[in-house]
UniProtKB/Swiss-Prot annotation:
Protein name: Ubiquitin-like modifier-activating enzyme atg7
GO cellular component terms, semicolon-separated: phagophore assembly site
Its job: E1-like activating enzyme involved in the 2 ubiquitin-like systems required for cytoplasm to vacuole transport (Cvt) and autophagy. Activates ATG12 for its conjugation with ATG5 and ATG8 for its conjugation with phosphatidylethanolamine. Both systems are needed for the ATG8 association to Cvt vesicles and autophagosomes membranes. Autophagy is essential for maintenance of amino acid levels and protein synthesis under nitrogen starvation.
Span(s) of short sequence motif GXGXXG motif: 436-441
Length: 765
């Protein structure tokens, strides 16, 4: 094969038609090849066309590979607080809504870092709520789509998601809006799934990059700027940024302006440096208004802040900038400034300068001119694989913080779908005083914690006995040894062991009881004052003691202080759960009665002369937890009502569909349903009844006479009530009621006697 044939073959192959070549091709093409003399000698050393073809292809591929641009991709870097912020946003606001949300990304040139640690896209803890850009950083526009299930994450059409994100860049370039938001050129998208029970976060970043076709290639690589040039450029750029939106800071135009004899440099604006030119910075939009007019090509720079520290590889966002250069600027050759300097080290030049060229040939364009080009951008992991990343936040979190979030999680999930109007803070912030730390008190406290209540105080005077742990869930066997731990102290400690975030304390004291004479006035008064202070300091008072008389004083105090008073009492297979009525704001009588409103006698000593079965709380084991759960749920319902403790009892009305009487929900949108006054349970029949009882004006505990006397005289009133047997009965009016009842009974008996006499001895007329 003679030399001209080799020349023709070489020219044909290197003209991008090699895929059409066969040995029998007979085409008239140029006689001169692209090789010089030394290369001609090399060509003639091949004996066959096939060998030459292979050699030329390899040589050309290597040559193109050397001059082709390789871009340093972004790597994601998420601060731990961001995961917490994303969790809170999902739980408290987004719930089931998985619409994409804006997120702020940041990057910066880090000259001191190794190349593999550069090009970091940082997402700070406040990225979901803040647009603040720290000094030295460049902003990037991001979106995060936090889906509801891991299946949604796996099944997401990731190519379509990437295409949608890239189309936003493409459209902004074509319609010119990119000039207002140049930071869109470095935009990113996050697909994520937050497992809020296990505190694991699965996520995948995409940094959409539009491909240029044909690809841009390095024509040459000019030398770096001098230290003086870099210093002047950095100072001029810093001045320019002060007057421009931070979304423009990452992309700009730069030019060297030399003074001419026709236009000498203004002395006032003359640079203090010894450079023969002045740097001028402009926005990307200024290209179309003639920013580079009259400026030599070697002094024109289309620039971007480059986070890459690779010596020859620019940052990922240059891909999109080059698409803008071709689409908006109509350039096929451009000088790119990969700006890598910062103000602190402006005397050490780091920036990379590239002269790039891309010859547009419509014959070999794979897509239509107005069609979005090929898009890539999903992030690879440390092994170079296209796959998602998983972060386990539990290993970084303080266990107490984990417990805080876990306690609230189930409650907040109620608001996602079932009860969106539920006011959890109203329950969580309610300070609860539990009078009694026994069977009822221990169950109630656990259920209050389940509702998220953070402040629980116990009052009890007893110690843990060996019969308690099986029925009282806060105690165990070791609490019974050596006489038994005090219930109030041990119960509060147990709550903190269960959940360290609860504020629980215990007070060992005996509640002064009606019918029990004072044996130590100083101690009794001290207990009275402590109880009075505790009731003032709490919002909801639970009466969970063993006797009726022990509930009397807290009932009086709670009514006088306007507190929510919750009461539960147990029988063998029955229970009563109720809320006490509160005094209305107008000062009138309470609409609903208290625990004592149905009594016609004042409480008295009920433990005197009791046998063993009467001294112990003998109930079916399931009664206490059932009553406790009803009591806590009743409090939750009360706190959701607009009137809180003054909520009226539900009323019966006829259901138009069933024709049966049903209680009306008041208000109709109450998230938890009814707010009954009393619930009476009958375990033997497995039924409950909702009962409403009005307040009684002669009640020994909540009647105006009793409450007013307590408010006026305080301890003196209580002292007299405990020492004078019939004082409360007389003051409340119950004694008069009893006398009238006796008189009425006597009248009935007398009338019966008279009628009998008349029958025996009829009067003669």
């Amino acid at each position: 094969m003679n030399l001209p044939e080799y020349h023709r073959l070489a020219a044909y192959i290197t003209s991008d038609h090699s895929q059409d070549y066969t040995q029998d091709t007979n085409v008239a093409f140029i006689e001169e090849g692209p090789w010089d003399g030394e290369e001609e000698e090399l060509i003639t050393s091949f004996s066959t066309v096939e060998d030459l073809y292979t050699a030329i292809c390899v040589r050309e591929d290597n040559n193109q590979l050397d001059m082709a641009l390789k871009f340093a991709p972004f790597a994601s870097e998420i601060e731990l607080p961001f995961y917490t912020a994303l969790s809170q946003l999902k739980i408290d606001h987004d719930k089931l809504d998985d619409s994409a949300r804006p997120v702020l990304g940041l990057y910066e040139p880090r000259a001191t870092q190794s190349p593999d640690q550069s090009s970091r896209m940082r997402v700070l803890g406040n990225a979901l709520s803040s647009n603040e850009v720290p000094s030295g950083h460049i902003r990037a526009e991001g979106k995060i789509k936090n889906v509801n299930t891991i299946e949604d994450f796996k099944n997401m059409d990731k190519q379509a998601m990437l295409q949608t994100s890239a189309k936003q860049i493409w459209d902004a370039i074509n319609d010119g809006t990119i000039y207002s938001i140049p930071s869109l050129l470095s935009s990113f998208t996050i697909l994520s799934f937050a497992n809020l029970k296990k505190y694991t976060f699965t996520y995948w970043f995409a940094f959409p990059a539009l491909h240029s076709e044909p690809a841009w290639r390095k024509v040459e690589q000019p030398p770096k700027f001098s230290a003086e040039e870099t210093t002047a450029l950095t100072e001029e750029l810093g001045t320019w940024r002060y007057s421009h939106d931070n979304r423009e800071h990452g992309f700009f135009l730069a030019k060297r302006v030399y003074p001419s004899s026709e236009h000498p440099q203004d002395p006032e604006s003359e640079s203090t440096s010894d450079l023969p030119f002045k740097w001028v910075i402009g926005s990307l939009r200024e290209f179309e208004s003639g920013f580079f007019n009259g400026v030599d090509a070697k002094n024109q720079y289309v620039s971007f802040v480059d986070p890459s520290t690779y010596h020859e590889n620019p940052g990922w966002m240059l891909r999109n900038l080059l698409v803008l250069v071709r689409r908006r600027y109509k350039l096929d050759k451009v000088q790119i400034l990969c700006y890598r300097d910062n103000h602190a080290k402006r005397h050490v030049p780091q920036s990379l300068i590239l002269i790039l060229e891309s010859i547009y040939d419509p014959e070999y364009q794979s897509t239509a001119p107005d069609q979005i080009p090929k898009v890539t951008g999903w992030e690879r992991n440390s092994l170079g694989k296209l796959t998602a990343k998983v972060t386990n936040l539990a290993q970084y979190m303080d266990p107490a913080q984990l417990a805080d979030q876990a306690v609230d999680l189930n409650l907040k999930l109620m608001k996602w779908r079932i009860a969106p109007e539920l006011n959890l803070d109203a329950i969580k912030n309610t300070k609860c005083l539990l009078l009694g730390a026994g069977t009822l008190g221990t169950y109630v406290s656990r259920l209050l914690m389940g509702w998220g209540v953070r402040k629980i105080t116990f009052v009890d005077n007893a110690s843990v006995s060996f019969s308690n742990p099986v029925r009282q869930p806060l105690f165990d066997f070791k609490d019974c040894i050596d006489g038994g731990a005090k219930k109030a102290y041990r119960a509060s400690e147990a709550l903190q062991e269960i959940y360290p975030g609860v504020d629980s304390t215990g007070h060992v004291m005996a509640v002064p009881m009606l019918g029990h004479p004072i044996t130590d006035e100083a101690a009794t008064k001290m207990n009275f004052e402590l109880l009075q202070k505790l009731i003032e300091d709490h919002d909801a008072i639970f009466l969970l003691m063993d006797t009726r008389e022990s509930r009397w004083l807290p009932t009086v105090m709670g009514k006088a202080a306007g507190k929510i008073v919750m009461n539960a009492a147990l029988g063998f297979d029955t229970y009563v759960v109720m809320r006490h009525g509160v005094t209305p704001e107008d000062g009138g009588p309470a609409a609903l009665g208290c625990y004592f409103c149905n009594d016609v006698v004042a409480p008295s000593d009920s433990v005197k002369d009791q046998t063993l079965d009467q001294q112990c709380t003998v109930t079916r084991p399931g009664v206490a937890p059932e009553a406790s759960s009803k009591l806590v749920e009743l409090l939750a319902s009360v706190l959701q009502h607009p009137l809180k403790g003054a909520a009226p009892a539900p009323k019966l009305s006829s259901n138009h569909q069933s024709g049966q009487l049903e209680f009306d929900r008041d208000p109709p949108n109450h998230p938890l349903g009814l707010v009954p006054h009393q619930i009476r349970g009958f375990l033997a029949a497995y039924k409950t009844m909702l009962i409403s009882g009005p307040s009684y004006d002669c009640c020994s505990a909540c009647s105006p006479k009793i409450v007013n006397a307590y408010k006026e005289d305080g301890w003196e009133f209580i002292k007299r009530a405990l020492t004078e047997k019939d004082y409360i009965t007389e003051l409340s009016g119950l004694a008069e009621v009893q006398r009238k009842a006796e008189a009425a009974a006597n009248d009935v008996e007398w009338d019966s006697d008279e009628e009998g006499m008349e029958d025996e001895e009829p009067e003669l007329l």
